[in-house]
């Protein structure tokens, strides 16, 4: 597959950002997150089949850029740059926007997509227009038009101020503006998360390592895509349950992947090591049920579940450990970290995380989920996306990282799993795993 870049430009907000909003102060929780770009690719079929493909591409290209400019007026920090550890310069420099053409039809690509080919659709950093400090850009976008007129929208969003829900809210606003381009669209009002968790310059610069430890690229790793359909999830949840509890989709899938990853590591390394699983818990619904989608920034905390030789590795046992740790991050847990006095509690909990990660002989796995966040509800006027994926980047640093997404139907789960090469060789042939999921299934075949 060949991808040819046609143009590169900056899309600026259609209305200038007021002087009093030129500096966006990030929250205390944002301070804990590295400014890494997280890419997601949305694939849309060409639904305008009665119109010549060149005309479809020209029209789509124009309206996407115009509606993006309108949307950025409300999401003004996204058109700026990360200034320093505690602020974003909302300078209206604009979103770096690339347009390209793909030599294939989209259906050909989706028949058997692979991570390396998908990464060709991400915004490249080689252009002179893309400065050397590319990680300082808050958002970069590439629109890749296939031979059939279908389009892949690749959006790289800086995790520094954008978590999964913030990202999806932005995309929905852009899509809604595109659908009603001739109308006056009102984007959601955003309450900055800094008002909930005030920033503090005294936070140690190495605090990021307490949230994301030992996940750096220290060896060769590979990524595989795993699909659980609805019926398999029903069976898996039943197997992972006990007389005292019934797991959620996230708990059952995470527990199974964790169990099989532990087994794969034991087989490839010839020894049984302690295992630590970190997971994220979204705060929004717990603190602001009515406006939870409209709070911008990182509003989550990392929890930790641990397993060792003496704790057992049965599926229902691992799932119960995970459930118990998730339940600890409740409304009281969150409220203690809010306000002016929350800084001390955050520092205290960072130390607890550091202690959980002290065992350098343990295997660490990081789980993150955007299930139930509405990733397939982003409709630009062409219907639901044919497929949504997170391909990572060519210079991704993370290993032992697992992302969970909804399938297009909403009742399945797609898992993107990155493991050490030797562990993956064992993991992908685990019969217990294969009883519930399939590897590298074509998105065209997924419900």
Whereabouts are the PLM-identified features?
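Soluble acyl-CoA-dependent acyltransferase catalytic core bearing the H(X)4D motif
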Residues: 2, 6-21, 34-35, 39-372
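Low-complexity, glycine/alanine/valine/leucine- and proline-rich hydrophobic stretches
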Residues: 357-447
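Detector for long, low-complexity, acidic/polar
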Residues: 24-25, 29
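Short, surface-exposed beta-strand/loop micro-motifs that present aromatic residues
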Residues: 30-31, 138-144, 398-406
């Amino acid at each position: 597959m060949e991808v040819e870049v046609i143009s590169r430009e900056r899309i600026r907000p259609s209305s200038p950002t007021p002087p009093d909003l030129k500096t966006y102060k990030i929250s205390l929780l944002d301070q804990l997150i590295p400014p890494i770009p997280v890419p997601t690719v949305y694939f849309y079929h060409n639904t305008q089949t009665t119109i010549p493909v060149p005309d479809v591409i020209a029209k789509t290209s124009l309206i996407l850029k115009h509606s993006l400019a309108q949307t950025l007026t409300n999401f003004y920090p996204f058109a700026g740059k990360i200034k320093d550890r505690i602020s974003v310069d909302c300078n209206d420099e604009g979103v770096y926007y690339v347009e390209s053409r793909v030599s294939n039809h989209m259906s050909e690509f989706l028949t058997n997509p692979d991570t390396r080919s998908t990464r060709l659709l991400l915004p490249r950093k080689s252009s002179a227009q893309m400065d050397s400090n590319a990680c300082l850009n808050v958002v970069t976008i590439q629109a890749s038009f296939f031979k059939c007129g279908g389009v892949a929208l690749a959006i790289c969003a800086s995790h520094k101020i954008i978590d999964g829900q913030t990202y999806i809210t932005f995309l929905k606003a852009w899509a809604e503006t595109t659908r009603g381009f001739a109308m006056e669209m009102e984007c959601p009002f955003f309450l900055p998360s800094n008002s909930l968790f005030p920033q503090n310059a005294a936070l140690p610069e190495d605090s990021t390592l307490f949230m994301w430890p030992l996940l750096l690229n220290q060896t060769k790793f590979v990524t595989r895509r795993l699909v659980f359909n609805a019926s398999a999830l029903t069976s898996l949840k039943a197997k992972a349950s006990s007389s005292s509890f019934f797991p959620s989709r996230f708990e059952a899938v995470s527990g199974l992947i964790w169990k099989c990853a532990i087994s794969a590591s034991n087989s490839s390394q010839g020894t049984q090591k302690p295992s630590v699983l970190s997971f994220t818990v979204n705060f929004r619904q717990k603190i602001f049920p009515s406006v939870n989608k409209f709070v911008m920034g990182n509003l989550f905390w990392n929890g930790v579940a641990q397993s060792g030789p003496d704790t057992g590795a049965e599926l229902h046992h691992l799932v119960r450990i995970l459930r118990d740790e998730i339940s600890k991050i409740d409304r009281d847990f969150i409220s203690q970290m809010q306000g002016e006095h929350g800084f001390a509690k955050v520092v205290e909990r960072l130390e607890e995380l550091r202690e959980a990660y002290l065992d350098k002989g343990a295997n660490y796995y990081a789980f993150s989920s955007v299930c139930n966040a509405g990733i397939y509800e982003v409709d630009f006027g062409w219907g639901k996306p044919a497929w949504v994926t997170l391909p990572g980047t060519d210079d991704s640093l993370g290993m032992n990282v697992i992302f969970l997404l909804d399938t297009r139907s909403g009742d399945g789960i797609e898992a993107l799993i990155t493991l050490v090469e030797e562990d993956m060789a064992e993991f992908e042939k685990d019969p217990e795993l294969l009883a519930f999921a399939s590897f590298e299934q074509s998105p065209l075949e997924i419900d």
